[in-house]
UniProtKB/Swiss-Prot annotation:
It comes from Neorhizobium galegae. The complex is composed of two ATP-binding proteins (NodI) and two transmembrane proteins (NodJ). ATP binds at G81, P82, N83, G84, A85, G86, K87, S88. This is Nod factor export ATP-binding protein I. Part of the ABC transporter complex NodIJ involved in the export of the nodulation factors (Nod factors), the bacterial signal molecules that induce symbiosis and subsequent nodulation induction. Nod factors are LCO (lipo-chitin oligosaccharide), a modified beta-1,4-linked N-acetylglucosamine oligosaccharide. This subunit is responsible for energy coupling to the transport system. NCBIfam families: nodI, PRK13536.1. Residues 17-26 have a biased composition (Polar residues). Residues 1-32 are annotated as: Disordered. The gene is nodI. GO terms for molecular function: ATP binding; ATP hydrolysis activity; transmembrane transporter activity. It is an enzyme of class 7 (translocase). It is found in: Cell inner membrane.
């Protein structure tokens, strides 16, 4: 998502702000199996996002193909797929920036694109790139962004301290954005998306280009938002990010859903055993040697993926090839994608 789309979607009507509105909306919290706190509910969970048989055709090309999924209020739902899978197109349709060729979309209980502007008043967006005003200070960026929502200067200034605390940028309030590190800029971009106290956050590749410590800081901030009852739609091509953050996810390929469910369930149901990666030999020749001792074999480039619970037998068979490198690890979402498509995900 680029700057033009982000600025276009920031045309909502006046929003009544209340710093306590998130907690006011939340019910008592309960512990769930993931260890995350989520709002409890005595009724069926409401759907923050609902797509029904949505198709998008652009220049005679089907970009999104009869896609259906729902995102429950209070969960983190992932759209996982390579570039060109349809993630950005789905996001544009959710924001009312593109009209589907067929199907129905509902966001926060409102039909989109019909009432997209009203829905956007309760949505925060973090685009893939930091669309910050580099010559402004951290504080000034938050102040200017709040005015897109027709908030008064007084209301924004009252909110800024809590946003700075959330982004862990209290000491950088009067520093120009151009002087911040990449991780600080991403935290500021995330805090900026909270100015209007949104119910739903749409995050497009939120940690792309960050080093591991900065990525973990962003993930920690996102978890705190989920505890507060926010709903997150996360688009990513990073398997570890999807596995760590998402309660459920939809795996996309060519605009089609090829799998949907909780990450660990997908891994268990589709893979179900550890993996040994074998490097440094001819995959075709090696596969003939180990095939009797594995459940399944996949090949990608020069790497042989052996899916097996009999790792000792596989290692024993490969000892006569001292130049080989072996990596034994638990299965992950990369293996799921490789199994479903026959190739590794393109970054």
């Amino acid at each position: 998502m680029g700057e033009n789309m982000e600025r276009e979607m920031l045309r909502p009507k006046t929003i009544a702000m209340d710093q306590n509105s998130a907690s006011a909306r939340s019910n008592p919290e309960r512990e769930i199996k993931t260890g995350r706190l989520e709002p409890a509910s005595n009724s069926a969970p409401t759907m923050a996002i609902d797509l029904q048989a949505v198709t998008m055709i652009y220049r005679d090309k089907t970009v999104v193909d009869s896609l259906s999924f729902g995102v429950r209020a209070g969960e983190c739902f992932g759209l996982l797929g390579p570039n060109g899978a349809g993630k950005s197109t789905i996001t544009r349709m959710l924001l009312g920036m593109a009209t589907p060729s067929a199907g129905k979309i509902s966001v926060l209980g409102l039909p989109v694109p019909g009432k997209a502007r009203l829905a956007r008043a309760s949505i925060g967006v973090v685009s893939q790139f930091d669309n910050l005003d580099m010559e402004f200070t951290v504080r000034e960026n938050l102040l200017v962004f709040g005015r897109y929502f027709q908030m008064s200067t007084r209301a924004i200034e009252k909110l800024i301290p809590s946003l700075l605390e959330f982004a862990q940028l209290e000491a950088k309030a009067d520093v120009r954005v151009s002087d911040l590190s990449g991780g600080m800029k991403r935290r500021l971009t995330l805090a900026r998306a909270l100015v209007n106290d949104p119910q739903l956050l749409i995050l497009d590749e939120p940690t792309t280009g960050l080093d591991p410590p900065a990525r973990h800081q962003i993930w920690e901030r996102l978890r705190s938002l989920l505890i507060r009852g926010k709903t997150i739609l996360l688009t990513t091509h990073m398997m570890d990010e999807a596995e760590r953050m998402c309660d459920r996810l939809c795996v996309l390929e060519g605009g089609r859903m090829i799998a949907e469910g909780p990450p660990l369930s997908l891994i268990e149901d589709i893979i179900g055993c550890p993996v040994i990666e074998v490097y440094g030999g001819n995959p075709d020749e090696l596969s003939l040697i180990v095939r009797p001792h594995v459940d399944r074999i996949e090949t990608s480039g020069e790497t042989l993926f052996c899916y097996t619970v009999n790792s000792d037998q596989v290692r024993a068979k490969l000892r006569e090839f001292p130049s080989l490198r072996l990596l034994e690890r638990p299965a992950n979402l990369e293996d799921v994608f490789l199994r479903l498509t026959g190739r590794e995900m393109e970054k």
